[in-house]
């Protein structure tokens, strides 16, 4: 969708971004901001001789350290952090979203997602981001700073079974949500 289409979709209530700031609308995307939560894997919770996390045991939440972000935080090289967007989004059943990194962060070696950049039709909630620092130096982040962008595409028809049905494990997620692999 173009900026005009995005603004119209939000104005009609068909697409929801909350809180919404029109200044964050770009020519064909919306910049989303860093929320106030981060979860980091604690090395003392990684078990086994080979340092393997068994994701089939549980949702992984006890392997993660929770931090409420009130001030800047630093991601060191080689670090993986689950964070969240400040905004909650609600995608209509005839649209999909794609979360992409911002080039300003990519040029510092930061990726904002590993594989989970696709947002299904019908999804509602905050978007969990999978930040990694692939660069040579630590990078500082401020809660509320623009961290990623979301691009929207209209489908030719609404999804028959949009996200949000009883098997949708991340629907209405709030905060940095760990893997639900053990529920697959």
Protein language model regions, located:
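DUTPase catalytic domain/fold
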Residues: 1-184
């Amino acid at each position: 969708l173009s900026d005009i289409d995005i603004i119209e979709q939000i104005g009609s209530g068909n697409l929801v971004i909350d809180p919404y700031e029109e200044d964050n609308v770009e020519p064909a995307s919306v910049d989303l901001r860093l929320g106030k939560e981060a979860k980091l894997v604690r090395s003392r919770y990684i078990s086994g001789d080979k340092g393997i996390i068994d994701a089939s045991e549980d949702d992984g939440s006890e392997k993660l350290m929770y931090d409420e972000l009130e001030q800047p935080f630093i991601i060191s090289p080689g670090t993986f952090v689950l964070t969240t967007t400040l905004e909650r989004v609600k995608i209509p059943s005839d649209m999909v979203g794609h979360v992409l990194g911002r080039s300003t962060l990519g040029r510092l070696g930061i990726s904002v997602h590993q594989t989970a950049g696709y947002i299904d039709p019908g999804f509602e909630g905050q978007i969990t981001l999978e930040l990694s620092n692939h660069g040579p130096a630590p990078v500082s982040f401020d809660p509320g700073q623009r961290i990623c962008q979301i691009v929207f595409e209209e489908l030719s028809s609404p999804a028959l079974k949009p996200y949000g049905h009883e098997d949708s494990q991340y629907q209405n997620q709030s905060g940095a949500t760990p893997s639900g692999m053990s529920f697959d």
